[in-house]
Structure formats: structure tokens, C-alpha cells
Amino acid sequence: MSLFYAKPEKAKMPTEKTALKGRNVPIETAAEHFVSGMPLAPPYPSNMQQCVFGLGCFWGAERKFWQLPGVYVTAVGYSAGFTPNPTYEEVCSGSTGHNEVVLVVYNPSQVSFKKLLAVFWESHNPTQGMRQGNDLGTQYRSGVYVYSDEQAEQAEHSKQVVQAMLTEKGYGEITTEIIKAKEFYFAEAYHQQYLAKNPNGYCGLGGTGIVVPCD
């Protein structure tokens, strides 16, 4: 989305009262991952863990994670807002409170959460508030949505490390929200693994040039 055409009100979060009402029935999505063939929906193997990340356009964000060894499956969707079972158009309206996010299901014995955090921080600019590059709106905000206290602690610690690195490079304060994961709503089938289906598709995702330690 061009900033020239973006409406400023899309950068303002709705309240639970003003958000769209949504629907009781989930929207239709894909059954399997287009790249790996793994089932998108749970239940997942018991040795897997999961986290949800928001870092701008979810097409490019998802590709960053499905390429990592140790990641079992990824899916794009909507979370951290109010509207149940939203559509893409509703999320883009700015009236759901949801973020465009990536669900990452991973094997912690093969890839660490610290590694996932490093990819997250390196792949976008977490200081831009309700936007990412030319994409303006609450659905493009930076966020880490955690499923355990351990994930929360690691995310907060990494945020401090990254803030120091960004400050040294002249960037402002990190605006990333780190909160307990809310319900994840799968996006439409069209959006799942979009850049694998459309290799020339556009997604304005860019980092700051930092390299985050993940040891």
C-alpha cells in the first residue's frame, strides 16, 4: 500500500466496541502447506512449540520462517485484535484491530526460539509503529505473540539487545508489542505461502541491516 493513498485513520486501533463484529464460522483456508505438504491446522506433534510474529506484509514474513531448518509448518493469519474470523478485506480496513501475522510451529531441538527471534528482528524495522515501509495500518505493526513465560522472557531480553543495536545505528525506540498470544485466525487459502505460488509477487519487507546474535 502506498502511503500517499493510505488513510491516516487506519493507523489508529479500534476498540472492542467499535471493531467489526465478524462471524462465528471460520473462513475457508488451505488444508496443507503449499511448500512442505504439512497440515496447516492443529493438532501438531507433541514435541513442537509455536509462536506468532507480526512484521509487516505477511507474504514475505512467512517465507522468512518456512525456509528455516527445524520449522515444522507456517501459516499466515490474523491475530491480536477483536473481530472473530475476519476476512482479509476487513483486516485491511483497520476496523478489526488484528495484525497480519505468521504462525510458526517449530521443533525446539532443531531450531531455537532465539534463532526465530533473530530472524524476526533482522527482517523488518521494528521502530515504525503502525506501519512497515510504505505499508500503513494497524495490521502492519511489529509484534511477538508468545505461548509461554520462557518465550516472553527471551523476547523481552532480545528486544533490549536489539534496541541497543538500533540506537547505535540512529534508529528510534522499538514499538514492537510482546504479549501473550491470542486466538489465531487462519487467512484465506490465497494468502497461504503466497510467494511460493507467486515468486514474482511484491512484498515490501525490509530490515535495518543489523545481525542479531542467537547463541
From Swiss-Prot:
CC terms in the record's Gene Ontology section? cytoplasm
**Coiled coil (UniProt feature):** none
- Extract one GO molecular function annotation from the record: L-methionine-(S)-S-oxide reductase activity
Question: Where on the tree of life does the source sit, at the highest rank?
Answer: Bacteria
Q: Give the active-site positions.
A: 57
Signal peptide extent:
none
Instruction: List UniProt keywords, sorted A-Z.
Output: Oxidoreductase
The answer to whether UniProt assigns keyword Oxidoreductase to this entry is yes
Write the Enzyme Commission number(s) for this entry. 1.8.4.11
Q: Name one GO biological process term.
A: cellular response to oxidative stress
Catalyzed reactions: L-methionyl-[protein] + [thioredoxin]-disulfide + H2O = L-methionyl-(S)-S-oxide-[protein] + [thioredoxin]-dithiol; [thioredoxin]-disulfide + L-methionine + H2O = L-methionine (S)-S-oxide + [thioredoxin]-dithiol
What protein family is recorded?
A: Belongs to the MsrA Met sulfoxide reductase family.
Q: What does this protein do?
A: Has an important function as a repair enzyme for proteins that have been inactivated by oxidation. Catalyzes the reversible oxidation-reduction of methionine sulfoxide in proteins to methionine.
Q: What is this protein called?
A: Peptide methionine sulfoxide reductase MsrA
Organism source for this protein? Saccharophagus degradans (strain 2-40 / ATCC 43961 / DSM 17024)
